[in-house]
């Protein structure tokens, strides 16, 4: 993107975009390798030239105005399209090179995406991937933190996003053998109301859970005994492994190793937890670089072929 900065008008817009994304003048200056005063002068020059206030700022706080939010979304698309044009002109042979930002939930970053990206960059040494861990799932096309490619669970809230539906997330109810020995086995979902549940929220995994067994269904009510609910799946898993409680929605791919090592057991295996939809999401653009297209297909293939416990592979 920095090629665009040769033109002063475009340079000012690029500085504005960076400030909007990081929310801090000093951090924007560091990332652009310029002084804080240069950032401040650039923003003032830009606002004076268009006669619109884009940012409200003081010594401790900075936020976009309504006009600033509109300008950010539009200029992000314009600069991205212009950069894509430059890439196409400079790369007629469609060599896979350049950089891309990919965001996913922390648990995916820690156990899967980091290894996938290492493999990808080994195959394509002229690439650089920025992997960001994000727990929130309510991305919209105008979200400042919306990266070039986003791994997302749940539902798509914004109709103007482009997405590809990939293999759904299989979920299991599980507990450690230690917990089962102490509190006994569970024979029906209704028994869960008498057990300790370690809950999850903000993962597309919150809210009432309905289990299915052939033509029968059972909805687990809010009466279950939840002492702790977290948006960090690994913190929940660690408590379950220690025998502190049961988790009702553990990703099957994450549970696989612990099930094979007899560190976890499936609770109510004859009851099915509904799959969670998974998507790769991005903003629409006129041109997609060879890197974007290849990386998108690579991540899709890696996710769709992730390790799963055998009896869950029954799609």
From Swiss-Prot:
Q: Which superkingdom is the protein from?
A: Bacteria
The segment(s) forming the HTH lysR-type domain are 8-65
According to its UniProt entry, the protein's GO biological process terms are: DNA-templated transcription
InterPro entries in the record: LysR_subst-bd (IPR005119), Tscrpt_reg_HTH_LysR (IPR000847), WH-like_DNA-bd_sf (IPR036388), WH_DNA-bd_sf (IPR036390)
Q: Name one GO molecular function term.
A: sequence-specific DNA binding
Q: List residues annotated as DNA-binding.
A: 25-44
Q: Which UniProt keywords apply?
A: DNA-binding, Transcription, Transcription regulation
Family assignment from sequence similarity: Belongs to the LysR transcriptional regulatory family.
The protein's job, in short, is: Probable regulatory protein. Its target is not known.
Indicate what this protein is called per its UniProt record.
Probable HTH-type transcriptional regulator SinR
